């Protein structure tokens, strides 16, 4: 009887250690905090990369970051495999929601500043985000919740 309990307990420990806390991600995808990530080397425009991500898995999109630790994880994922400095991330249209007006209260109806692009890339060596022309092609990272 004692041997049966010991074996049962041993099997329970093995089962719990195998189930772990890692996300159930498809092969070739990496897990972090309940999400799955995959870096893709091919170059695409922002829109094409986003579309490609949505076709890879239900709920998949270009990667979003919600902590510096998550961004660091993506850097460790992209740097060795992509060997590229810039990758598309899921942030877009950051200036579209802004409302500009002059200090005298009049509306902004004339602009003469350098273009601010609407799509963002992440510099893989230091997590710096840069605005880029959405039509430029870069590698990219997809993410979905496991």
From Swiss-Prot:
Main location: secreted
Short name of one Pfam family: Lectin_C
GO MF: toxin activity
Signal sequence bounds: 1-23
Keywords from the UniProt entry: Disulfide bond, Hemostasis impairing toxin, Platelet aggregation activating toxin, Secreted, Signal, Toxin
Disulfide bridges in this chain: 25-36, 53-142, 119-134
GO CC, alphabetical: extracellular region
UniProt-listed SUPFAM superfamilies: C-type lectin-like
SMART domains attached to this UniProt entry: CLECT
Localization of this protein: Secreted
Location of the C-type lectin domain: 32-143
Tissue: Expressed by the venom gland.
Regions crossing the membrane: none
UniProt xrefs under Gene3D superfamilies: Mannose-Binding Protein A, subunit A
PANTHER family: MANNOSE, PHOSPHOLIPASE, LECTIN RECEPTOR RELATED (PTHR22803)
Subunit note: Heterotetramer of the subunits alpha-1, alpha-2, beta-1 and beta-2; disulfide-linked.
Record family assignment: Belongs to the snaclec family.
Role this protein plays: Agglucetin specifically causes platelet aggregation and surface exposure of integrin alpha-IIb/beta-3 with a GPIb-(GP1BA-) dependent manner in washed platelets. It binds to human platelets in a saturable manner, and its binding is specifically blocked by anti-GP Ib mAb. It regulates endothelial cell survival and promotes angiogenesis by activating integrin alpha-v/beta-3 signaling through FAK/phosphatidylinositol 3-kinase (PI3K)/Akt pathway.
Protein name as catalogued: Snaclec agglucetin subunit beta-1
Species of origin: Deinagkistrodon acutus (Hundred-pace snake)
